[in-house]
Swiss-Prot record:
It is an enzyme of class 3 (hydrolase). It catalyses: N-succinyl-(2S,6S)-2,6-diaminopimelate + H2O = (2S,6S)-2,6-diaminopimelate + succinate. Keywords: Amino-acid biosynthesis, Cobalt, Diaminopimelate biosynthesis, Hydrolase, Lysine biosynthesis, Metal-binding, Zinc. Pfam families: M20_dimer (PF07687), Peptidase_M20 (PF01546). The lineage of its organism: Bacteria, Pseudomonadati, Pseudomonadota, Betaproteobacteria, Burkholderiales. It comes from the Bacteria. The gene is dapE. This is Succinyl-diaminopimelate desuccinylase. Zn(2+) 1 binds at residues 74, 107, 170. It comes from Polynucleobacter necessarius subsp. necessarius (strain STIR1).
Length: 383
């Protein structure tokens, strides 16, 4: 069994449903300290939601003049769902038919193990490496993400820590290992719209104001609006309604209020304040009496096809013979926080088809190649 597969299994065996770390970061820290890293654990969050974060760094021979490459990821996993639906225990790593099963196998404990072993191999073969290597690991990525990477980035910025490159181990591959790198993510802006009406007996509509009827034209306009056209990196901004609620449950009462939950996934062609203003104008022009609670989940970020993406492309090509694709599709990630303090941020990892699913798994034969890709990226950028 390879060192990478063995460490992956050890990490999967740790029960680490958000915000628990389950001992994963301790395993990682000990491995890194053994090869010369300075490691620091930072616990944050309220007593009922304690988050564990790990920062580790090994300075290169060039000191502060050298480049800094950071591996970033998360040790927390989503809940298992019904245990009886799993073919094997989700926290007992199990190899079956060429697949490694377990919660977090794809998202993202295989990547974490690959980071560590790639770094061990790199440091052994390049003891005088010029650039520095860093790790930023959290146990609060799958949850609220209020006490994880975001506070660690603020901490690093406060201490003046420069970052040049960051590889996040999210599972980005689609059909085969290496076919996709995420070099950016769309922003996320959510809102809860409350439209005021007047409750009344449904037989006397003249005595009430039905907020569903009043809102229908405006909602239709929101759905049909082209918010932007996107660009070479991003699809056009999308507006989606996720929940609609009105009424008392009785079929003879005009509701007094309509509540609509919605979300924008927006490109760099739009700014949050522009989207808010345009949406509110449509509602005001419709004569609605309303209020909205807004939540900005993250701003979009993009890393062009520069040094980091280029090095990762070459590493993938050398290991898999695949010409990879750069993409910004998918949901938000902790890259939205890291991009504020790091020049180049990309995400790359194993196949994502089973992430968060029952019987989550990775292809066993992908584990060592993934590690090799990370190591070859280090060799190109900081050796």
């Amino acid at each position: 069994m390879s060192a990478t597969l063995k460490l992956t299994e050890a990490l999967i065996a740790c029960h680490s449903v958000t915000p628990a770390d389950g001992g994963c970061q301790d395993l990682i820290a000990k491995r890194l300290q053994a090869i010369g890293f300075h490691a620091e654990s930072v616990v944050s969050g309220p007593e009922n939601f304690q988050v564990t974060n790990l920062w580790a760094i090994k300075k290169g021979k060039a000191g502060d003049q050298g480049k800094v490459l950071m591996f970033a990821g998360h040790t927390d996993v989503v809940p298992t769902g019904p245990l009886e639906k799993w073919t094997s225990d989700p926290f007992t790593p199990t190899i079956r038919d060429g697949m490694l099963y377990g919660r977090g196998a794809a998202d993202m404990k295989t990547s974490l193990a690959s980071f560590v072993v790639a770094t061990e191999e790199f440091v052994t073969t390049h003891p005088d490496h010029q650039g520095s290597i860093a790790f930023l690991i959290t146990s609060d990525e799958e949850g609220p993400a209020n006490d994880g990477t975001v506070i660690m980035c603020e901490r690093l910025q406060k201490h003046g820590q420069r970052l040049d490159y960051c590889v996040i181990g999210e599972p980005t591959s689609v059909n085969t290992l290496g076919d996709m790198i995420k070099n950016g993510r769309r922003g996320s802006l959510s809102g809860k719209l409350r439209v005021k009406g007047i409750q009344a007996h449904i037989a006397y509509p003249h005595l009430g104001q039905n907020p569903i009827h009043l809102s229908a034209p405006a909602i239709s306009a929101l759905v049909e609006t082209q918010w932007d056209k996107g660009n070479e990196y991003f699809q056009p901004t999308s507006f989606q309604i996720s929940n609609v609620h009105a009424g008392t449950g009785a079929n003879n009462v005009i509701p007094g209020k309509l509540v609509v939950d919605f979300n924008f996934r927006f490109s760099t062609e739009s700014k949050p304040e522009q989207l808010r203003e345009r949406l509110e104008k449509i509602l005001k022009d419709a004569g609605l009496e309303f209020e909205i609670d807004w939540v900005l989940g993250g701003s979009p970020f993009i890393t062009g096809d520069g040094d980091l993406a280029g090095a990762l492309r070459k590493a993938i090509k050398a290991e898999t013979k695949i010409d990879t694709e750069l993409s910004t599709t998918g949901g938000t990630s902790d890259g939205r926080f890291i991009a504020k303090i790091c020049k180049e941020v990309v995400e790359f990892g194993p196949l994502n088809a089973t992430s968060h699913k029952i019987d989550e798994c990775v292809i066993v034969d992908d584990v060592v190649p993934l590690k090799n890709i990370y190591r070859k990226t280090l060799e190109q950028l900081i050796a």
